[in-house]
Amino acid sequence: MSQQTPLAYAVAQWLQQSSTSVPADQKAKLQQAAKSVSEAFGVDTSSAEQQAQYGSGPGLQAIFDIFLKTQAKMGAAPAPAAASSSSTAPAAAAATPSDEDLAKAEQLKAEGNKAMSAKDYGAAIEAYGKAIELNPNSPVYFSNRAAAFSQIGQHDSAIDDAKQASKIDPKFGKAYSRLGHALFSSGRYQEAVEAYQKGVEVDPSNEVLKKGLAASKEQLSSSSSSNANDATASRGAADAVSAPSAGADAGAGAGGFPNFGGGAGGMPDLAAMMNNPMIAQMAQNLMSNPDSLASLMNNPMLRQAAERFGSGGGMPDMSSMMNDPALRDMARNFMGGAGRGAGGNGGNNMYG
């Protein structure tokens, strides 16, 4: 095995993975590039044997991210010979963007905003990234890219960008909104509370931050007692399954969805659901928007509910799930509603 083989495999794998989050006209180019690398070095990313041999590591993107973070930390460290008066100067001060770069960065930001409105999140991430390259001192660019990362479920990247935005400008309230949203969506409720709390301190009149803080506190309280309630909930679900049905309303109350006839054990009547125009529209939007579908499936609360239901734990508590601002945001979006939930990436919390 050549020493280049693992690297070639990682490059081909990264190209294929990247093709899922770019515009259609760029997808074919990335796939062709992956094919060329695979053929040139004799690697096959679809091979289970090569996957086990070369693909068990963290991946090329993760390794590169670690390199960038390490480089940033080393670059931010004060030089031993530096004068004390310069030790407090920002690291970026030596590379102040030119007026031309600033204007181009603003143009790229506008392109990213337009892509966000069109739900083309891959293009938005690319545009904001180019703007950051030209002007890394703008908290808005990092904040906007954090919103785009959240939309496709890349919450770790969103957290990094939101933290960088707050580091550049500690009084930029929207950075804490992005950070709280990404932390909440990752199931890190205590950290989400802290992020939203900091945001409320710097921007007391921001209703999005207040709602996000309230939702995070409620979810933190709920999640802290969920383990104690799991056994009781399972017994209650078993009783509901064995109890005789008292009609459609009883089915809905026994763990089913509201406003739909309940089937056995509180399961919703799927035929009735698909006859509902809002549910039909939501299903259609899900099928036509793979990025949002990926974000939905990455939501920790929804994933936990699905796992609990699959193991016989009964239907999830829909009212509790709708307290998750990320789920509420996506539900309104899929059903054609205007505005977003607390802590989300829309409504009064639009990108800059």
Swiss-Prot record:
GO terms of molecular function: molecular adaptor activity
Alphabetical list of Pfam families matching this protein: SGTA_dimer, TPR_1, TPR_11
Ranges of Low complexity composition bias in the record: 80-97
UniProt KW keywords: Repeat, TPR repeat
Segments of this protein annotated with the region Disordered: 80-103, 217-236
UniProt key word Repeat: yes
Record carries keyword Membrane: no
Stretches assigned to coiled coil: none
Domain of life: Eukaryota
TPR repeats, residue ranges: 105-138, 140-172, 173-206
Alphabetized SMART domains for the sequence: TPR
Example of a GO cellular component annotation carried by this entry: TRC complex
GO biological process: post-translational protein targeting to endoplasmic reticulum membrane
Family: Belongs to the SGT family.
PANTHER family per the UniProt record, alphabetical: LD24721P (PTHR45831:SF2)
Described function: Co-chaperone that binds to the molecular chaperone Hsp70 and regulates Hsp70 ATPase activity.
Descriptive protein name: Small glutamine-rich tetratricopeptide repeat-containing protein 2
Species whose genome carries this gene: Mycosarcoma maydis
